[in-house]
Each structure stands twice: as structure tokens, then as C-alpha cells.
């Protein structure tokens, strides 16, 4: 497990405005908890605590949305 920005397809973060949204997203994916990290390196994005290793996370590089 690890603490990280949870990622969507193409290495894109989940944008957020509310902690509740991120906490629900993170816990649904097996994390202990989550919150909205404001003004972080990837903008306002969901940060998860103790996210399982099989869940994709934001890695180095750009978001490749089509």
C-alpha cells in the first residue's frame, strides 16, 4: 500500500473541490481514507492514504487524455 494521487486512465488525476468526494473515491478503491489536496503539484486533486498497490496512481509525466 502507499499514499498517492489516485489516477484515472492516461495518468490523469481526479480533480476535486471537496474532501468528501475524495474520501469516498479512495475508500471505494480500498484506501484507508482520502482528501482533496488543494494547490498541489497537479492542481486540486484527490490524495489517498494506504491505497492498495493494484490501484493506478499518478506517475511522472503528463496526463494523456485523448
Curated annotation (Swiss-Prot):
Keywords attached to this entry: Disulfide bond, Ion channel impairing toxin, Neurotoxin, Secreted, Toxin, Voltage-gated sodium channel impairing toxin
Residues of the LCN-type CS-alpha/beta domain: 2-64
Family per similarity comment: Belongs to the long (4 C-C) scorpion toxin superfamily. Sodium channel inhibitor family. Alpha subfamily.
Task performed by this protein: Alpha toxins bind voltage-independently at site-3 of sodium channels (Nav) and inhibit the inactivation of the activated channels, thereby blocking neuronal transmission.
GO molecular function: sodium channel inhibitor activity; toxin activity
Species of provenance: Buthus occitanus mardochei
Disulphide bridges: 12-63, 16-36, 22-46, 26-48
Keyword flag Secreted: yes
Matching Gene3D superfamilies: Knottin, scorpion toxin-like (3.30.30.10)
Protein name per its UniProtKB record: Toxin Boma6b
Domain comment in the entry: Has the structural arrangement of an alpha-helix connected to antiparallel beta-sheets by disulfide bonds (CS-alpha/beta).
Pfam families xrefs: Toxin_3
SMART domains registered for this protein in UniProt: Knot1
Tissue: Expressed by the venom gland.
Keyword field contains Acetylation: no
Subcellular location: Secreted
Amino acid at each position: 500500500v502507499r499514499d498517492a494521487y489516485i489516477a484515472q486512465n492516461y495518468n490523469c488525476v481526479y480533480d476535486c473541490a471537496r474532501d468528501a468526494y475524495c474520501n469516498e473515491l479512495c475508500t471505494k478503491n480500498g484506501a484507508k481514507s482520502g482528501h482533496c489536496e488543494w494547490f498541489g503539484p497537479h492542481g486540486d486533486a484527490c490524495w489517498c492514504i494506504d491505497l492498495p498497490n493494484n490501484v493506478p496512481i499518478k506517475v511522472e509525466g503528463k496526463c494523456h487524455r485523448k
